[in-house]
């Protein structure tokens, strides 16, 4: 051991020497053949811990700080600690803390401000005593200020006690001195790697390099850009990105070591202790310029001086106050910048000089500083080992984290037979959010040091692998312990406000734990976890949303699937029956799960769909709840102003309506919602008409009205007649049920007449003779023609017709691209829509975007124009201002494609589409429609072609003499299944009025076949109003085939049979 600095009280442990100051490093004979584990320096005393766990002290003992009454000039053993294996010590001005290998803390010395934590009334304690209030807590680090103390536990809890004159306890401005350890609750949840204390200021350092400081700040020693004391922990933002791995404090200054080996200093600089070649104070962290060419691996602070070790040269550098020789430079001069400590330093990787005895060279193991003294533990070159590196943490001094080594250790014990300390270790780890937040860090490229509002610093794949390795059927005791810790200790302690982004990580990782997906744990773990998540304050929730938004899709889907499973589980319980006494808690649970999904859905939408929207669909909803009833309840809640946008706790008394969370509905469920909404509106319109009619009996000025919207049309003038009626129709009348009458036909419209009306009028309106729409040969689709002589009234009519079709649950045949439905739902068409409408043009645009070279102008020869046909002639349109003069290049090609798409789908047809849009929404607007995705709305308007002919046969009903196994029915289905697809579709058109099936699928298409009189010479007859087929009792298969084909080939017109 080498010692230098103030020896006036014997604090260097050199024995009875004459000098009061030692100007350069001097060997201590006492430590020959002894290995030092730790050194603590007080203002006038020093404590040494040897490798065997024994403690020695020397120096001033006026306040009992040595823990014994022996000699003060040379180190003497503290016999009271003889039975303890001490691993670390820390010293205040005149008090000492010692930590043993069991995590227990012993204290002695001055206790004027409660800095010993013993809750006693004595001014001084001369013999070490155990701090009993910490005896049940496993402490891994201790630190001392002059009159206060800090401790870090294995569970990442920070405790403080002693003086709080300057706020150095971090407990708030109202807090007086504390005589027993107090938990700093404001830091809960953060994963810490170090605690440090200066004269009257304190620091904690997180695993990802964030620093929180509090206490005295007269000289800027907290690095917060001012000189105001802090009474609660404050984040030192300027160092967050610097990968800080170690921090130490002097009386009024601070030094921080980076992962790359740089040193930042700040605070009091009056003696040059900051190393910036000045005596100025620094209120912001500043890098020590003269050390920037070297990699520093150790840094230590004395009262007003700083030491740094550079392993490449083996040298120790010091700067600051030198009046007591503490710089080791051979003089008492102060140094304002790093200066080499005198000595024959030997680099661990170097070669020992041959001409000098190796005993004259020192190979530094570790440096220590404190008060006005400095020490260096060294070895001779022949015994030289690697020096300590403060950038690498000692696992024994760190908090619990879930890692490969720890899991292997736990799994190494046979199931059901691991010792109590292992159970305590598992419990401690999974009871602490701080420990979980320090687990699964992204260590590749030191990524976790970039933790912030946009990056979590977590390796999610590591989290998944380690959780699955830990939770195994072969080790049920581990799973049970983890589940119990999460349920009883971790989750109940979660709060809505969090001190830092690092305290949020477990919200990201815990869903990867298989225990969360176990339905047995839904109500005890998953739902309480969701409640804590939903109740987070706006700022931390926003950060969590940011982190979710950059997850890999499968990881994001995992969280979505988890809470979908929770919802289904709860709804199944609800269907079985919930006792009235449990309804309130059930409501709360269901609201929680749905609110979590709502947050995740919001994130998904903001990111442009991290996962497909249909991944949020809960297909079981239709089976588990009455959607119609749910919708009616939701409408009533809206009418009475019930707000479900706030937290879960207030929602327990409000019945859950799934309609509040419409993103879980699949297309079929949404269709049911829309139909329910339409039925409600129709009923309201009918009721209003009835009320008006009743009033008209007593008040002649009030006209009677029809409760239905009646369209009387002629087949030969179907468009003109419909326009005439609809033009005069009031908006409110569109909400009435639609009844269609064809002039000269006897059919009563029970649905079939209406079906054919829509079929015929759309065929007429879309006919090229009107020139309203352009047909695209490549895609066989139509789009609005930008050159039409028709006024906007016709487009308005088509919009109304489409709206009426949806409103009256009728499929219509529209050959529009998906872009139409996007625009109806206020979504922007994209290049994909151009590819659908104009495949060749779309491919060309994609080739332009994908072209890898820079010579786009020469290769494509494009400018911001589009060439359109105008009655046989071509016309060039500019896509942007001065488009003809703007060449398409690598930088603006995306803008060109966007402008092209915008022209085709928006600008060129704006007035026409606006008329269509207005007509459509006049009938079919509202909140429910906006729940649909564009492809779902398309399927609802035109139906789909997901044919399942066996399902059709299965759902068919029979009347009269027929049943499923009747000979005629058997040959009917044989014939039907042998028909080609086109004939089958014709049969659907013949029987139902449309060759497409409803969005709800074949199961919703109920056909009825009934027997009729007459002979086999009669044709089958359809009643499209009722999807009813009159089928004569054919006995021959071939006869049935011929008659059926003959019937379906002539299917237009209605008459009563």
UniProtKB/Swiss-Prot annotation:
It catalyses: S-ubiquitinyl-[E2 ubiquitin-conjugating enzyme]-L-cysteine + [acceptor protein]-L-lysine = [E2 ubiquitin-conjugating enzyme]-L-cysteine + N(6)-ubiquitinyl-[acceptor protein]-L-lysine. Pfam families: HECT, WD40_RLD. Keywords: Cytoplasm, Differentiation, Repeat, Spermatogenesis, Transferase, Ubl conjugation pathway. Probable E3 ubiquitin-protein ligase involved in either protein trafficking or in the distribution of cellular structures. Required for spermatozoon maturation and fertility, and for the removal of the cytoplasmic droplet of the spermatozoon. E3 ubiquitin-protein ligases accept ubiquitin from an E2 ubiquitin-conjugating enzyme in the form of a thioester and then directly transfer it to targeted substrates. The keyword Cytoplasm applies. The active site is at 1025 (glycyl thioester intermediate). T.wilfordii induces abnormal expression of spermiogenesis genes including Herc4, the spermatogenic cells in the convoluted seminiferous tubules decrease and the lumen is obstructed by large deciduous spermatogenic cells. T.wilfordii has apparent antifertility effects. Gene3D superfamilies: Hect, E3 ligase catalytic domain (3.30.2410.10), Hect, E3 ligase catalytic domains (3.90.1750.10), Regulator of chromosome condensation 1/beta-lactamase-inhibitor protein II (2.130.10.30). GO terms for cellular component: cytosol; fibrillar center. GO terms for biological process: cell differentiation; negative regulation of smoothened signaling pathway; protein ubiquitination; spermatogenesis. Its EC number is 2.3.2.26. One of its GO terms (molecular function) is ubiquitin-protein transferase activity. This is Probable E3 ubiquitin-protein ligase HERC4. The keyword Nucleotide-binding does not apply. It is found in: Cytoplasm, Cytosol. RCC1 repeats lie at residues 1-51, 52-101, 102-154, 156-207, 208-259, 261-311, 313-366. Ubiquitously expressed, highest expression is found in testis during spermiogenesis. It is specifically found in spermatogonia, spermatocytes, and spermatids with little or no expression detectable in the spermatozoa, or interstitial cells. It comes from Mus musculus (Mouse). Disruption phenotype: Disruption causes defects in spermatozoon maturation and impaired fertility in males; females display normal fertility. Males produce litter sizes some 50% smaller, as well 50% of mature spermatozoa have reduced mobility. The lineage of its organism: Eukaryota, Metazoa, Chordata, Craniata, Vertebrata. Residues 730-1057 form the HECT domain. It comes from the Eukaryota. Its main location: cytoplasm.
